[in-house]
Design a protein with these regions (language model features):
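N-terminal helix-turn-helix DNA-binding core of bacterial DNA-binding proteins
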Residues: 1-36
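Amphipathic alpha-helical recognition patches that constitute DNA-binding helices
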Residues: 3, 36, 67, 71, ...
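Short, well-ordered turn and helix-capping elements at secondary-structure junctions
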Residues: 22, 26, 54-56, 70-72
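Basic amphipathic alpha-helical segments that dock to polyanions
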Residues: 37-44
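Beta-hairpin "wing" of winged helix-turn-helix
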Residues: 45-62, 67
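Basic, amphipathic "hinge/linker" alpha-helix immediately C-terminal to the N-terminal HTH DNA-binding motif
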Residues: 61-80
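Amphipathic alpha-helical dimerization/coiled-coil segments
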Residues: 74-109
Length: 109
């Protein structure tokens, strides 16, 4: 949800657009299928983190757009804070493991 909220913080998007933007910005690392995306969007909408509206495009297609709400912005700040804490802890452990491995390797040379 942090990734979806981050994308919607920049601009309103429709479902397919979210999947394509996520794929593009992550350099093909994150690829959400419709069966995964739409339940996430519905969950965020039920939590009032996002809202949706219909828009008729010039080509006649009607698309459902999603936008982040003020509550969603607060949730995103909280999620970013949690991610920073988590990633710092992982980096600390990885750094520690790398240092120990390098030290052990030097001892056996």
């Amino acid at each position: 949800s942090i990734l979806i909220l981050s994308l919607l913080e920049k601009r309103d998007m429709y479902g397919y657009q979210i999947t394509q933007e996520l794929k593009k910005q992550s350099e093909n690392i994150f690829e959400l299928k419709e069966g995964t995306l739409y339940p996430m969007l519905h969950g965020l909408e039920n939590e009032s983190a996002i809202a949706s509206y219909w828009f008729d495009a010039d080509n006649g297609k009607r698309r459902k757009y999603y936008q982040i709400t003020p509550l969603g912005k607060k949730l995103l700040i909280e999620k970013k804070r949690e991610w920073k804490t988590y990633s710092n802890a992982v980096n600390t452990i990885i750094g520690s493991v790398s240092s120990i491995t390098a030290f052990r390797g030097a001892c056996y040379e």
